[in-house]
Structures are given as C-alpha cells and as structure tokens.
Design a protein with these regions (language model features):
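N-terminal regions that are enriched for targeting/export leaders
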Residues: 1-93, 173
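Aromatic-residue-lined binding/catalytic grooves and analogous aromatic/hydrophobic interfacial grooves
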Residues: 2-5, 9, 182-317, 324-331, ...
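N-terminal catalytic cores of NTP/NDP-binding nucleotidyl/phosphoryl-transfer enzymes
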Residues: 72-121
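Glycine- and acidic
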Residues: 84-94, 194-199, 344-354
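A short acidic (Asp/Glu
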Residues: 95-107, 128-137, 207, 212, ...
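Catalytic or ion-translocation cores adjacent to nucleophile or general acid/base/metal-coordination motifs
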Residues: 113-169, 331, 343-344, 359-428
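Internal, well-ordered alpha/beta segment that forms a basic, Gly-enriched binding/recognition surface
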Residues: 120-211, 215, 222-226
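Substrate-recognition/cap regions that form aromatic- and gly/pro-loop-enriched pockets
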Residues: 303-304, 312-363, 370-371, 380-389
C-alpha cells in the first residue's frame, strides 16, 4: 500500500481479506446493519453448554476479587452471567481520553440494548508510561485541543522506563492547567482530584473513571465497572489452583510449556502474523522496582519448583512452587503477558472479548497456538477444548465505529453535558455501521505491518 494513499473502506477490507483477517469477515457481515442491530451481532454468544461451569467459576472469582478490594457488586457478576462479555480495548487511561471514552460509551450502549445494567472493562495497566514522544503519549498524557495536559508531576525521565503498574506509590494525581484557564471541566477536575493521594496509580484511575463514567450511565442506563491487570493476575492465581483447568500443567509441565512457547515463537515469526509483537516472555512479567522484566522459566532438577530468570541476562529472580507462584500473582509481583491474559480471561471462561483492531486477529493466532499444542500433546479435556476453540470469541467494538462521524459532532459530546450525549446516542444508533466507520483508518497500521512482515521474511 502506498503510504501517501488513504484507501477507501472497500479497499481496506479487500486488503484485510487477502490477509485472511478475521477483522475483515466481522465487518463485512456487519456493515449494512444499523448500529443498534449490530450490537446484537457483536454480543451474540455461541451455544456451548459446557461454558456454564467455567462462566460460573469466573463470576465467583470476580465476586471474590471485588469483595477483597472493597468494590462488592453482585449485580455486575449477575450481568456477566446474563451477557458473558468484557471490554478489553483500553490501555490504562481516563475517560477524558477520546478513544477510551468512545470505547466505553460503545460498550455501555451495546449492553443497554440488551437491558444489561453493568459491564466490565479491563484496562491494560502493564502498558508503558511513554508510548510516543512527539507528541508525548501514554496513560498520563491527554490533549485538550492542541494543549497538552499532564496527569502527574513525574518528569519524563522518571516515566521513560516505567510501566503504568510500576509508578511510585502512594500516587497523587496532579492535573496541569491548559492555557485556557476558563475551562470549567479542568478546573472542576483539579479541585476534585489534585489534593487526593491513592494507594497506587491503578486505584487513582479507577476512582476517576468511576466518577466520570456516571455521565455514560446517565445517558445509557448501563454502568461500566473498571478493573486492571491486577484482576487478571488474581484470576490466573485462582485458575492455577483449579484442577478442572489446564493452566497449572501449561506452566509447570516442562515438556508442555516448552511446546507451547516454541509454537508461540514460531507463530510470531511467521508470515501469518501482522498483529503480535516480538517481545517474548514465558507467560509472565516480573515486576521489579522500575519496570516489568521479561522472564525465562525453567524447572528445577529436583522437586516441583520453577526457576524464574530474567530473560536478558539469566539472573535468577525467584524459585517458586505452585503456592508461591499463586502468592506472587496475588501480591502483584507477577503479571500475565498478553497471551496468558486472554487465556485466563476469555479462552477458559466463556466470555467474549470486545476490543480493538489488532485484537481480532491476535485472538485467532492465540487459538492457533493452543490448538497446535493440544494436537501434539493433549492437555485439554473435551469441555474446555470446545470452549477454548469456539467461534466469535472476540469482536471489534468501541472507537473504530465512530471514525466516520464529523469531528464537530464528536466535539458536541463534551464530558460536561449529559444532554448532548443523549442526543448523540439517539442520532447514531439508527445509522448503518458503514456510515459510522468511515475509511476505518485505525486499522491501516495493520496493513503496513503486513507489508513490513513480508519484507522481513
């Protein structure tokens, strides 16, 4: 694709189709639907009776986590059972970021169309604090028009090597003032949050999003509950102890672990991959003082312990049995990588993952890795196998569906105006998806990735 040419939606879908992209098939089947009808397609669940015990187990684990963290919400757990889906499009960020706001507005609208009162969003808190430098991007940076807004007084040098979950604790929000001091929204936020100290950055963002999300709930009737990768770690810990699930074998059985990781590496290096990154870690990240370390896992020569080594230099970081591994996950010393995160949240729970452009083909590659591994060395029972390899485990949702909307119309849904938001929802819900999605520019980087991957081969 010529880097100077912006392809039409039809051209984009054709090129994605040539890559056998799941994203192309999804959109082709959805484009002619009005948005309010597309919600039903997006949230549609496969008829797999085996999902019920796994889904109930997820709901129980979610209930326990919410209770432990002081956020008990039985209605959310009931909503998950009614409509097994979660939104996973977000990096850690607050709802004043346009993309994050639109992701969660879309999710809330979709759930509301099915009369579901609560939805669950998992934000990726293992994201780097600085993801781009010109202009600065990351979870602690916003833009208000052309004015930069910082959410922390930490310097760029302090943030450079950190992941969001590695920010200093306790954590204090410090919202810088845009040049326009008359902006009541920023003034109100500074008054509300700048004096407060939180246990950690993740808790700060959850508190802010819970408050800002009231506007979405007011407009749709469905409330979004925000969690982060600490919940994914908690879920992995619970699944390690569940004999009905294969996770413990995947981690502790040296032969099986090596098989899965080798197939994963081969898949990432293959022609089929234009979505997965090349930073390889053995299932987990180890949380050091300033950053997340990539791991290499080995079995001890005696006993059932694992040796966790820093991948870059072989330094031994820990020796762990199953119980100690569980404690490290629960204590926040270990985080799941992207592959394992999807495995514990969606592959073995019955939940559909709603997310962004790259997720749609990433999940297919992850399924391929697991299917090839299970074919060569059977480690799944039949109910889990049926659940893991079900169709439509993921679906595109969120901000991409708003790309074709006039920017002035998007500007009208200012966070301070619930009336504007309600009017916006009424305006768009009867429009066809193809009218809303525009040229679908958010996926053009995937086409460029495919070209680069082909050149590298």
């Amino acid at each position: 694709m010529d880097s100077k040419t912006v392809p039409t939606l039809g051209e984009t879908l054709k090129q994605l189709g040539m890559l056998q992209s799941a994203l192309a098939q999804q959109l082709t089947e959805t484009l002619e639907l009005p948005l309010e009808q597309a919600f039903g397609r997006i949230l549609k669940q496969p008829a797999i009776t085996e999902s019920h015990p796994f889904l109930n187990s997820f709901s129980d684990n979610l209930n326990e986590y919410l209770e432990q963290t002081g956020k008990k919400n039985n209605a959310l757990c009931d909503s998950i059972i009614q409509c097994p889906a979660m939104q996973q499009a977000d990096h850690s960020g607050i709802l004043l970021d346009d993309e994050i706001f639109l992701n969660n507005l879309f999710f809330s609208m979709a759930l509301s169309s099915k009369n579901i009162p609560y939805g669950l969003t998992i934000q990726c808190s293992t994201v780097k604090c600085i993801s781009a430098r010109a202009p600065l991007k990351g979870p602690l940076f916003l833009k208000d028009g052309n004015q930069p807004v910082r959410l922390s007084d930490l310097s760029n040098s302090q943030l450079k090597s950190r992941s969001f979950c590695n920010l200093p604790t306790p954590f204090q929000i410090s919202i810088s003032a845009p040049a326009d001091q008359q902006d009541s929204r920023w003034k109100r936020l500074r008054e509300m949050w700048n004096t407060k100290t939180f246990t950690c950055a993740e808790d700060a963002f959850i508190a802010i999003n819970t408050e800002l999300g009231k506007q979405i709930k007011y407009a749709t009737g469905t409330e979004i509950v925000f969690l982060d990768e600490r919940f994914t770690s908690f879920l992995a810990a619970k699944q390690l102890l569940n004999a009905q699930l294969p996770l413990a074998d995947m981690i502790f059985d040296a032969t099986l672990r090596s098989l899965i990781l080798n197939i994963k590496e081969t898949t990432i290096d293959s022609d089929d991959n234009f979505v997965l990154g090349h930073d390889l870690t053995d299932f987990f990240y180890f949380k050091s003082e300033q950053k997340l370390e990539l791991l290499a896992i080995e079995n001890c020569t005696t006993g059932a312990e694992l040796i966790l080594k820093r991948r870059s230099d072989g330094t031994v970081l820990a020796r762990v049995g199953k119980r100690e591994l569980v404690r490290m996950l629960e204590d926040g010393r270990l985080f799941c990588d992207r592959f394992l995160g999807y495995f514990v949240r969606c592959f073995g729970t019955g939940l559909k993952a709603l997310g962004g452009t790259s997720q749609q083909d990433s999940v297919g590659l992850y399924q391929s890795i697991l299917r090839k591994s299970n074919t060569q060395l059977q480690f799944m029972n039949t109910p889990f196998e049926n659940l893991c390899f079900r169709d439509e485990l993921t679906f595109l949702a969120g901000a991409p569906f708003f790309e074709g909307i006039d920017s002035s119309l998007l500007d009208s849904i200012n966070q301070s105006s619930t009336d504007n938001l309600g009017s916006f929802i009424e305006l768009i819900k009867t429009r066809k998806v193809k009218q809303l999605i525009g040229n679908f520019q958010s996926c053009h980087y995937l086409l460029k990735n495919a070209v680069k991957n082909k050149e590298r081969q």
